[in-house]
From Swiss-Prot:
GO BP field: L-histidine biosynthetic process; methionine biosynthetic process; purine nucleotide biosynthetic process; tetrahydrofolate interconversion
PANTHER family attached to this UniProt entry: C-1-TETRAHYDROFOLATE SYNTHASE, CYTOPLASMIC (PTHR48099:SF5), C-1-TETRAHYDROFOLATE SYNTHASE, CYTOPLASMIC-RELATED (PTHR48099)
Pathway annotation: One-carbon metabolism; tetrahydrofolate interconversion
The protein's name: Bifunctional protein FolD
Key words of the record: Amino-acid biosynthesis, Histidine biosynthesis, Hydrolase, Methionine biosynthesis, Multifunctional enzyme, NADP, One-carbon metabolism, Oxidoreductase, Purine biosynthesis
Organism: Mycobacterium sp. (strain MCS)
InterPro entries: Aminoacid_DH-like_N_sf (IPR046346), NAD(P)-bd_dom_sf (IPR036291), THF_DH/CycHdrlase (IPR000672), THF_DH/CycHdrlase_cat_dom (IPR020630), THF_DH/CycHdrlase_NAD-bd_dom (IPR020631)
Catalytic activity field: (6R)-5,10-methylene-5,6,7,8-tetrahydrofolate + NADP(+) = (6R)-5,10-methenyltetrahydrofolate + NADPH; (6R)-5,10-methenyltetrahydrofolate + H2O = (6R)-10-formyltetrahydrofolate + H(+)
Top-rank taxon, per record: Bacteria
Length: 285
């Protein structure tokens, strides 16, 4: 018997129904949320991501604010665009689409974002607030992972979660999220240089693979019945996009998130959620 599929697309659609109602209520008050994007250059992947985010906005009634800039823009011109969105009352939250061209300073750009308008939840100030368990926009992918597990009633409280990956977008903040009292998981943070990795994963109730190594998690590394979340994105030798979880894991695990179609749709859903939540907070005063 194969694993139960953790369906991110269906779960995203449920979130969108809720967001559409909340946005409609805000619009009645004259407070329609606005999501901004800053896209530099013409990278096809980045363009596709940005199009997808604005398509999502249209589905739930959020206003789209696009700032598409040429690849040869200067740091000063990029900074001016960020400052404009920080000051723009129509923009509730926004993102700077990465990667930026190599002549631009990504960290400087991200730190220039108003933390209150940080739709990704990855501003250093907001990550610090997560450490301190203070209210702040939450990182979208870790939030999506927790929501997906709860949607399918995978027990988190008391669970041993092994996270493979130490990046700032998933691995590090996910550990912070899962060890809050509201989640109460025990987290082991591993990575590509972890010795004897299978010894850790075989003890896990939940495995989150976010290392970007094709099919690194195999069936022999998974305890029967465990939940496995595949967040990794990389390309195999043929140039095909693949995740971190090998196909044979589906025969051993109790729950598996597909990739694509698992966590990715929820990352985008919680980008919108962060914007709507800020609009609601502003409406409350």
């Amino acid at each position: 018997m194969g694993a139960i599929t953790l369906d991110g697309k269906a779960t995203r659609d449920e979130i969108f129904v809720d967001l559409k109602e909340r946005v409609a209520a805000l619009t009645e008050q004259g407070r329609t949320p606005g999501l901004g994007t800053v896209l530099v250059g013409d990278d096809p992947g980045s363009q596709a991501y940005v199009r997808g985010k604005h398509s999502d906005c249209a589905k739930v009634g959020i206003n789209s604010i696009r700032r598409d800039l040429p690849a040869d823009i200067s740091q000063a011109e990029l900074d001016a665009t960020i400052d404009e969105l920080n000051a723009n009352p129509e923009c509730t939250g926004y993102i700077v689409q990465l990667p930026l061209p190599k002549h631009l300073d990504e960290n400087a750009a991200l730190e220039r974002i108003d933390p209150g308008k940080d739709a990704d939840g990855l501003h250093p100030t907001n990550l610090g607030r997560l450490v301190l368990n203070e209210p702040a926009p939450l990182p979208c992918t870790p939030r999506g992972i927790v929501h997906l597990l709860r949607r399918y009633e995978v027990e988190i409280a008391g669970a041993h979660v092994v996270v493979i990956g130490r990046g700032v977008t998933v691995g590090r903040p996910l550990g912070l999220l899962l060890t809050r009292r509201s989640e109460n998981a025990t987290v082991t943070l591993c990575h590509t240089a972890t010795r004897h990795l299978p010894q850790f994963t075989r003890e896990a109730d939940i495995i989150v693979a976010a290392a970007g190594v094709p099919h690194m998690v195999t069936a022999e590394m998974v305890r029967p019945g465990a939940a496995v979340i595949d967040v990794g994105v990389s390309r195999d030798d043929n140039g095909k996009l693949v995740g971190d979880v090998a196909p044979d894991v589906w025969e051993v695990a109790g729950h598996v998130s597909p990739n694509p179609g698992g966590v990715g749709p929820l990352t985008r859903a919680f980008l919108l959620t962060n914007v709507v939540e800020r609009a609601e907070a502003l409406a409350r005063g």
